[in-house]
Amino acid sequence: PISGNIYVKGRKISDFTSKEYAKTMSVVLTEKIKTEMMTCRDVVAMGRYPYTNYFGRLTKEDEVIVNESLKKVSALDIAENDFSQISDGQRQRIMLARAICQKPEVIVLDEPTSFLDIRHKIELLDILQEMAVKDNVAVIVSLHEIELAAKIADYVMCVGADGKIEFGRPEKIFTDDRISSLYGLIHGTYNCMYGSTELKKPEGT
């Protein structure tokens, strides 16, 4: 069972109002959202709703932030496209732009590199690093790709199949023995020097 509390700046998030929560934290999930006749720009603009008035109208400043968010994920060229008709990789970039548009203090992303080709994967990780360093945003990312986590994370938390948890700096957690033990590697090993798993050589070679 899940228990405990989550605090942001010393305050439990369960005490936040819905608007306070939306201004503080944004979330990017892998599951697809269904939209009816919405352009990519419309979806990104949803990130500004916590800041709008009772009528939900966007100001000129909001429109500028929407454009900046689209530009940051290299999606200005598809801004007027129907969101339901774009590719999975493009959807991922638009959903990231929506999260950026919220101007959050914390952003949580569930496997954000899924569906992305190598170019857009690198661009996305670069954006997240920039948000963390320049904008002082706390970036929490779930990844299956250990090699990516080793390169971009300040701290990592690894969860094994048995629920065992390892937490710390990547260089302390991503060691051959720890990764092999945590994930029960039998048919291969983890090479901490290259940040990758390696198969055992076939017998007789």
Language-model features: locations:
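Catalytic Walker B motif of ABC-type/P-loop ATPase nucleotide-binding domains
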Residues: 107-110
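Conserved ABC ATPase "signature" region
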Residues: 45, 60-78
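ABC ATPase nucleotide-binding domains
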Residues: 177, 181-205
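Conserved ABC transporter NBD signature motif
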Residues: 4-12, 21
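H-loop (His-switch) and adjacent beta-strand-loop-beta switch element
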Residues: 156-169
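Conserved catalytic motifs of ABC-family nucleotide-binding domains
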Residues: 103
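Conserved ABC ATPase signature
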Residues: 82-86, 90
